[in-house]
A protein has these predicted regions:
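Structural motif at the C-terminus of the N-lobe alphaC helix and the adjacent alphaC-beta4 loop
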Residues: 1-4
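Short beta-strand micro-motifs within the conserved protein kinase catalytic domain, predominantly
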Residues: 8-19
Length: 215
């Protein structure tokens, strides 16, 4: 893949024990920058990030690929140009639509979580197939985390991992958008609500989503 904010593959190959992929050296992750900045980003910076993040997802989605592990650690700034945000780590990525037939995958259950619990969509938590809307739901949680400094399910604890995931799933599924986004600009609530109302195979309106960060 090659696009703005998608690392170029410089070389690849394999040895007896390893697969090798060489990419350009990039800068710090958004999570690292957030930590360095006393766990705070200006609203203007968050809006600029949001627009670029949507750009990256629209591009990979146009190539019939979903990322499935959207989180602050997987967005890095450029080394030579820190104004460009790069999306990295496609280890969990998969095709959601055939490049030949154009047929979208069907909704179903894989039986396992794919992604990072804190930012994964509710459907992913319950082991369902993911589509474009799930990548974008993760973006919403990431933006809310940057604005609030926490997500309500990150402190859920249980000795039983299945029970823990069930509790997190129920929170993500049932918490009203207005509660999760309380104290935040109404555009963030609109962003999350729009994504949650998308059908599994529906193409997101990326222009509309970008417009929610232009204020």
């Amino acid at each position: 893949m090659k696009g703005v904010g998608i690392p170029e593959i410089l070389s690849y190959g394999r040895t007896k024990h390893y697969n090798i992929l060489v990419e350009p050296f990039l800068g710090k992750s958004l999570f690292h920058l957030y930590q360095e900045n006393n766990k705070h980003f200006d609203m203007k910076d968050i809006c600029l990030m949001g627009i670029q993040i949507i750009d990256r997802l629209e591009w990979i989605h146009s190539k019939n690929v979903i990322h499935r592990d959207i989180k602050p650690d997987n967005f890095l700034i450029g080394q030579s140009n820190p104004n460009i945000i790069y999306l990295i780590d496609f280890g969990l990525s998969t095709k959601y639509r055939s490049s030949v037939s154009g047929r979208h995958i069907k909704f179903g259950f894989t039986g396992k979580l794919t992604g990072t619990t804190k930012y994964s969509s509710a459907n992913s938590i319950r082991g369902a197939e993911q589509s474009r809307k799930d990548d974008l739901e993760s973006v919403a949680y990431m933006i809310i985390f940057f604005m609030k400094g926490y997500l309500p399910w990150q402190d859920v604890d249980s000795k039983d991992e299945i029970n823990k995931l069930f509790k997190i799933y129920m929170m993500k599924k049932n918490i009203p958008e207005k509660n999760l986004c309380s104290g935040l600009p109404q555009e963030i609530c609109a962003f999350l609500k729009y994504i949650k109302n998308l059908h599994f195979e529906e193409q997101p309106d990326y222009n509309y989503l970008r417009s929610l960060f232009k204020w």
